[in-house]
């Protein structure tokens, strides 16, 4: 079954290069503040939840493959990196800060308006992009803040409207958590209300199915 994807976007203020640098610096500062954050109660961390289970290889999205040709380092899988993030209050603060700031600052536009293309994956470094571009930029900033790329996987879902959408899954010791441009809340995957289709593999450059017999043609532009 193939799934059509929405082209709707909500416009937000543009993100400048200076702000991008500021976001990376903010993440580093939050990590440097770890001793103070560690003094916070454990309740500051998300509750324990179950992780998603992959069921086998899945077909990559063509636009993702093209993105990997342009940005091979963004898709590379380093198996010496941790496969899971051990959350601390400081890391949790960094994750939430990056998610909120990118959601607030990037202007959501369709690939047609942005690139004159049906589907294109890119980093929203010019301050414009659709859902996957938001998540790819968040991942880059989180990597710069010290989190392992291998534990942050681009993920295709079906949203509450039955439309395709792209989110970023963080695989952690407290379960799989989702960063999404449609909400500032970082939620356990089962609490998103989405149907999870597939995500990037942690073992090689490719994709793994998450239990639904569906192969979206593009990532959602939401």
Predicted regions and their residues:
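Bacterial N-terminal signal peptides
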Residues: 14-32
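A structural boundary/capping signal
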Residues: 2-5, 36-222
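Hydrophobic alpha-helical segments and their boundary regions
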Residues: 11, 16-17, 61, 127
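N-terminal secretory signal peptides that target proteins for export/translocation
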Residues: 1-15
